[in-house]
Amino acid sequence: VGSIAIQIAKQVAGLTVIATASRAESQEWCKQQGADFVVNHQNLVEEVQQAGFQQVDFIVDFVDVNMYWDAMVTLIKPQGQIGSISDPVESVNLRALKGKSVSFHWELMFTRSMFQTEDMIRQHHILNQAATLFENGTITPTINQCLSGFSTENLKRAHGLLESGKSIGKIVIEY
């Protein structure tokens, strides 16, 4: 998700992108996806500020809202926006955002269909737009490894790669 988000933020929205990664190969991957800056997530506030940013307008969390909550509260500008797809294990203190008038947005891909919202057709339009961006090369797939043959062996291998914590990009098993 993060790799595509980097591409969309850079190529579609035209934003300056600060990505987080700790390993050298992950940092290089983020740069290849279009990140302007890549910082180590273990010292997030310090790293972002050393990159020349005291605060930022937008933050997107794909990993762990609890782990990075204090850093996000510190780094977000007044009237900024924070988005997250992660599920907090513990409650987060939304009051910490009030003084800065920060907006917090949860995102779940299936909300429109689950609740039959009035704008449900919007999901169709979003997916069509994503397809167009892929087709015209504005954004590119993040496949980094392809395993041939849908088998128990390949499922175990793919799962092992994910569990290793060293996987970058997507792993595809071709049927």
What is the predicted role of each segment?
Residues 69, 127-130, 155:
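A general structural signal for well-ordered alpha-helical segments in protein cores
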Residues 1-43:
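Mid-domain Rossmann-like dinucleotide-binding core that forms the NAD(H)/NADP(H) cofactor-binding site
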Residues 10, 31-32, 49-52, 73, ...:
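Non-catalytic positions within long, well-ordered alpha-helices that form the structural scaffold/packing
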Residues 39-105:
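Glycine-rich cofactor phosphate-binding loops and adjacent beta1-alpha1 units
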Residues 149-153:
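Conserved loop-to-helix N-cap of the C-terminal "lid" that shapes the substrate pocket in Rossmann-like
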